[in-house]
Amino acid sequence: MSLHRTLRRFLRKWKALVYAVSFILLIQAFFTFQSSPNLMEEEHLRRLKELQIKKHQELANSMLQGERALVHGRDKLVLNPRDPGFREEFFKHSNNEINILEDHNIGQVDKMEKPVLKPNENKFEEIHFATEKVPEIIVKYQPKCDITIKDSISALSRATTDRCKQQIADAACKMQDGTLFPKSMPRTCKHESKFTFDAPMPTSFDPDIRPVRICYMLVVHGRAIRQLRRLLKVIYHRDHYYYIHVDKRSDYLLREVLKETEQYPNIKVAPWRMATIWGGSSLLQTLLRAISDVLRIWKDWDFFINLSALDFPIEKDEKLVQYLSKYRDKNFMKSHGREDEKFIRKQGLNRVFVECDQHMWRLGERQLPEGITVNGGSDWVALNRRLCDFAVNGNDQLLTQLKHWYEYTLLPAESFFHTLVQNSDLCETFVDNNIRVTNWNRARGCKCQYKHIVDWCGCSPNDFYPSDLVRLRTSRPVFFARKFEESINQEVVNHLDFKLYGDYPPGTPALHSLWENALRVNSKMPSDCNLSVVSMLQVEMHKKDEEFVGYVVTFDAGWVGRRGAGDDPATSEDGSRVQLQAFLSPQPSLRILDRSSNLAKRLETASVGTNWDVKELVIRDWGGLVGPNSDVHLVARWSRSEDDFVVTVVVIDPLNVVADYNDFRTPSKAAGVTETPLSLKKPLRPGRWLVRFYVQRQFTNICAELDFYVTPQEFKGGIEGDSVLREINRGVVDDAQVNAANRNLYSIRTTLNLARNNQAETELASESNHVAGLKLRNWVDFVVSSGWKAKDACLVAQSPETWREAQPRRCFMPRQGTPNLCENTNWSSLSPDPKTELISVKPDGRIR
């Protein structure tokens, strides 16, 4: 009773307070209930998501079976993944909450990434689905604020898709209201300034130390499969791991990589692909995603080293393993080596960038976060497993904020890991050495050659030549160098390969030969009983002793009986087919006419092409294949001389009309290369063009002449028969309009007094009327064959019997010869090439 009376007195005295507290508790409970998750609704949504993912997996598995069949060359597919109806069904069920990973880039579905398909069981254990959420598909561009930043307005005016514009606008609005980035970030390193650990090469190695295992990530693109094979051959060891990411746009390379690496269980190809661009934020995303994969796939590697196909080792694997074993708790990154403020400005770290539509858009300036030190240098690194695990699985504030900050950063991979390590508890693991040498020639490598894909001027390293090998001598421990392109210079790669692992035996074939895939096309032609092309399979560039010698063309051919002109050779009476390779070589095009002239004494080579590499000083479209809409460059190589002089070149079109002229000076007191862009109005007239060389407008004396051919265009946007081809293949009609720079050509034409070829004009007008069919193809063949010749052919087979078995009896002739087998033909890409062949693992764990 006393307790009851006491409680009553308490309530009378504090009644108002009790009511107030009770009211507050009720309000809190109400809002808690309103904001708490609806468990039944969440369960319902979870089940819907599971059903949706299951449907995706079923469709992806169906697609996988079809892709497997394509990869292995099966004719009878369970389901054809190239069928637009099937792919439409697959992507129809896509939800933008599920980011399906990309496959072989078949089709033009750009709303989301597509599913990755596993060609064999050794490569992928499952079809992976990304966990990150992709942005909603924007139907209409709607900025959320009035954008006033000049750079952002410029980016919006140049972006083409609504989705990209929306990304730019969203970032710009957050920039303007100051919410895009945190003003400061936490620093947990106990050192006030940047810390660097010195890791010299030990004079001796402890044999009792457990050797490290390395996980190599190879980021590859293009078509140089042989160079990639050669790199794998020299860095391979059964104790290491290899994870290969093939660029989303390199379908040919992906197929070849999958085929070449099947026999090695410690090599995996990424089941996802990204289309990375120079300087793009996607480069860092690719690295982090790969690190996440290899952490999950392999549990016992110690170091992560990223390479490209343009890298090559300069020390043996054993020495690298010994060095890293000594410093297994360190991280190797190259710092910029200049003042921080200067590096930040040159790197664009004080600017905001957004990547979309395969472009890095500059949106404006930003302040660097307070509290941390921003560091950077090279994006080629060697990271220990502890840092890798922290970078992808950590969740502290510094890491989370840095990842967000670098989403809007140019060249993020060149700075992210440096900044993360220098400001975290791992700062004492930083070694200012990325264990490689890069061949920089900034006078040639910093030409703003990436302005078409990034709103910034950047630099790119140069290829190594034998004369650059002296740069490999450094005071710091280095184990790799870059860049090497065998299509530019193979001798330097041979030198390093032979130095590390010894010369190949005398008589080894193809040591100084190179083949590189250039093209895959389809072609069909009618024929009688002669052997006829059924389908062209691929074209490979061929170099020998550092010189381009031609193209190797692989094609299916068949014997076709007498049929109508429009019949398909593939439907011959007996279906007999063989596979052949043909060697096509360009005809000599440079003629020296006055060998006594100074020009003739110095001019070594001259050629015309369309893909001029300002950094390496070469034309990359080997053979000078020019079309009506090509940008044409004249490139000449000159020997050394004490005297220089002015060269005049005059360009004459197929109608014998002067179309352009240029004056330039030869290199002074040195050998060198000159490049002259020709100002020719498009479309160019198809046929034979002529370039004449004079010494400083001495037009009475032609020193040299160079031919090049403009080939008629057969397709427009991949479609045959477009009526616009008539105008394209006719070329510029008015002689007064043939020069794109509107130069006054009257005096040159008057001086040379060339007779216009009116018959050629009549023939050109007649030929250009054909926009499809046999007559257009014959015209193309005629122009191409004027500058190219088929030198030889060989049989793609194990035995000559293949030819005799395939040849119909009605086409057999006594004493008829059989083509040589390609494997016995030195120009063939199927002939032995031991320096790039991947073989079985040897007892020492290597394949070289």
Curated annotation (Swiss-Prot):
Glycosylated residues, chain numbering: N306, N530, N826
Reaction(s) the record says it catalyses: UDP-alpha-D-xylose + L-seryl-[protein] = 3-O-(beta-D-xylosyl)-L-seryl-[protein] + UDP + H(+)
Binding-site residues, UDP-alpha-D-xylose: V219, D247, T276, I277, W278, D379, W380, S460, R482, K483
Protein origin, superkingdom: Eukaryota
Residues in compartment: Cytoplasmic: 1-14
Membrane topology of this protein: Single-pass type II membrane protein
Pfam families: Branch, Xylo_C
Subcellular location: Endoplasmic reticulum membrane; Golgi apparatus membrane
Molecular function in Gene Ontology: metal ion binding; protein xylosyltransferase activity
Residue pairs linked by disulfide bridges in the UniProt entry: C145-C173, C189-C427, C446-C459, C448-C457, C529-C811, C794-C822
Pathway(s): Glycan metabolism; chondroitin sulfate biosynthesis; Glycan metabolism; heparan sulfate biosynthesis
Region annotation Disordered: where it falls in the sequence: 824-848
Cofactors named for this entry: a divalent metal cation
InterPro entries attached to this UniProt entry: Glyco_trans_14, XYLT, XylT_C
Ranges annotated as spanning the membrane: 15-35
Lumenal side: 36-843
GO BP terms, alphabetized: chondroitin sulfate proteoglycan biosynthetic process; heparan sulfate proteoglycan biosynthetic process
EC number: 2.4.2.26
Family of this protein: Belongs to the glycosyltransferase 14 family. XylT subfamily.
Function: Catalyzes the first step in biosynthesis of glycosaminoglycan. Transfers D-xylose from UDP-D-xylose to specific serine residues of the core protein. Initial enzyme in the biosynthesis of chondroitin sulfate and dermatan sulfate proteoglycans in fibroblasts and chondrocytes.
Name the record gives this protein: Xylosyltransferase
Organism field: Ciona intestinalis (Transparent sea squirt)
The gene coding this protein: xt
